[in-house]
Amino acid sequence: KVTFDKNDEDITLDIACDLEKGTHTVTLFKRQDASHYFEFVGFEIDPDGEVLENPPLPARKIECYGDSVSAGAVCEAVDFVASCDPEDHQGVYDNAWHSYAMITARNLGAQIHNIAQGGIAIFDNTGYYHAPNYIGMESVYNKLCYFPEGAKGVTPWDFENYTPDVVLFAVGQNDPHNEGHEDFDITDPDYRAKWKNAYKSIIIDLRSKYPNATFVLLLTVLCHGEEWDKAVDEIANELNDEKITHFMFTRTGKATPGHPRLPEQYEMAEELTAYLSNMGDKIWG
């Protein structure tokens, strides 16, 4: 795990030195959620070394839309299992590699695009992401860069670049938060209808782009009220599409008041892997 605090200059990091002769493999990944980014310039190797061809990417493809849990936030704080998060952790415990979404992809031998952003809700101006001008998934799901501070500002995503076989949609945990006001109440009929319609509009648009994909709607084991799960279940039923399902973990909404740690992330991945595996090979293009 490498951290650095310089934003405007090239940094050279020693990955390995004095290796024995032979074939070596490097796996490079970004630990934090989608709004964190770095520019990868390249590898420097020994003058006597050579770069071999990468093995082909898996044919199976998963895409995940989620929040901090899907991004693996605070998952390495293993001394705080089933507890609130450590104070002022500043992201040092984040590791997307150990998110249930990425574990599931590895379990199933699939590529994954993990569009997971900590604090995000469905609606703009709700949730916790990008205070005080909160940005919701309704403005994020179809963007490559979705925050105005990016080097090129907000940029659209070309859905032709990646067509998943399976879409995981795990948003809803942060939606009660209404900064400076009472939390949104999913049991209120008017709000419930508004929230469900916004959620469905995203799914319907994604379905139009991925007509053959299997969609799995879910919330995670981070504590939340069961009415949110019921609302997601209603959405799945109302969409009336046999390839759009609602999945619940054994401990959905009940396992921890803080972010899921490594044991809980792997627990979720095991259950989600089994769920997708039980659908058979037909879900993969």
Predicted regions and their residues:
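N-terminal secretory targeting modules
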Residues: 1-96, 283-285
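Structural recognition of the beta-strand scaffold that forms the well-ordered cores
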Residues: 61-65, 70, 112-116, 165-170, ...
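Sec-exported extracytoplasmic/periplasmic mature domains
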Residues: 70, 109, 113, 172, ...
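Conserved SGNH/GDSL esterase-like catalytic core that processes O-acyl groups on lipids
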Residues: 86-188, 222-226, 259, 263
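Aromatic/hydrophobic pocket-lining residues that form the small-molecule binding cavity
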Residues: 195, 199, 265
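Generic structural signal for well-ordered alpha-helices
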Residues: 199-203, 232-233
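Extracellular serine-dependent O-acyl
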Residues: 214-285
